[in-house]
């Protein structure tokens, strides 16, 4: 593995750990400059295509989910680990279905379900962008549904 600091081609593995069922985290040390860096290995699978609202298709990108979650959880008591856990959960749920295509609507619903469990404010933020809330009444209605749901528990 090439060193990201000095570009030397050889490094040794210091530590290997499974991060989830599909990836391995490796801590490496450059044999030239002795600096350490981390790499991740993942199983390569058939690429998943996402069907967008306009029916165009693009490759599934976990970073888009992560970015949306980061924006929704900004200034909220939600850790990066919790966000990463949601992304991994959604990826695993999609992979369990053995599908080659999925609609953005389905992914968005999965994200909202997990956010609703984690942080209601982040959920409303995400939902407002995802569902394109047009006015304050839409916000109020969404908040009412959350309050009603909480009352049922």
Curated annotation (Swiss-Prot):
Entry cofactors: Zn(2+)
Zinc finger boundaries on the chain: unnamed: 3-33
Highest taxon of source: Bacteria
GO molecular function, one term: DNA binding
Domain ATP-cone: 48-138
Cofactor note: Binds 1 zinc ion.
Keyword entries, A-Z: ATP-binding, DNA-binding, Metal-binding, Nucleotide-binding, Repressor, Transcription, Transcription regulation, Zinc, Zinc-finger
UniProt xrefs under InterPro entries: ATP-cone_dom, NrdR-like_N, RNR_NrdR-like
Pfam families reported in the protein's UniProt record: ATP-cone, Zn_ribbon_NrdR
Biological process according to GO: negative regulation of DNA-templated transcription
Similarity-based family: Belongs to the NrdR family.
Described function: Negatively regulates transcription of bacterial ribonucleotide reductase nrd genes and operons by binding to NrdR-boxes.
Protein's name according to its UniProt entry: Transcriptional repressor NrdR
Originating species: Clostridioides difficile (strain 630)
Gene: nrdR
């Amino acid at each position: 593995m090439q060193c990201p600091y000095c570009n030397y081609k050889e490094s040794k593995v210091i530590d290997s750990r499974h991060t989830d069922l599909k990836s391995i985290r490796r801590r490496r040390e450059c044999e030239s400059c002795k600096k350490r860096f981390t790499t991740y290995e993942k199983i390569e699978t058939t690429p998943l295509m996402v069907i967008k609202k306009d029916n165009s298709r693009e490759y599934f990108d976990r970073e888009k989910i992560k970015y949306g979650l980061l924006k929704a959880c900004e200034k909220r008591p939600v850790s990066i680990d919790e966000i990463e856990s949601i992304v991994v959960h959604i990826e695993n749920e999609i992979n369990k279905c053995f599908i080659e295509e999925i609609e953005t609507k389905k992914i968005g619903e999965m994200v909202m379900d997990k956010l609703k469990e984690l942080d209601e404010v982040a959920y409303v933020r995400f939902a407002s962008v995802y569902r394109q809330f047009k006015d304050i009444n839409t916000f109020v209605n969404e908040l009412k549904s959350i309050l009603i749901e909480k009352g049922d528990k």
